[in-house]
Amino acid sequence: TSGLYQKAWPEIVSAFQALGLGDPKEFYDAIVTAGFAIRNGEVGTLGELSPKPHPWLYAEAARVGLGIDFTQRHYVIGIEDSGAGVCSIRLAGFAPIGFAGGNINKGGTRALCTHFADRFDQILSLL
């Protein structure tokens, strides 16, 4: 999301450090965010134009940012801590992994998650 630099990116870096996975920029093929590219060659999208729970952000990130054809959508997962994000992932045709700390449980969207994790290391074991 556009909150990448304020919230998501520091949490991603922290999780990678805690799990001993090194630099997340070296781990992923690309890091696609709403609004900003992390480094040259990566694609950012403007999720503010169609905010969650609209599926456009996830669908466009997979198609344009990662080059994944819609027919291959069953290979795509999304990790979210918000109910709107889970809905967005599901509406895009992807499998959502819910992550604790957001409003998934309170919002009643946990049942839409393919899996749910309380900790990042649990997500790693699902991949």
Language-model segment annotations:
Residues T1-S2:
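Conserved phosphate-coupling serine/threonine residues in phosphotransfer and NTP-handling enzymes
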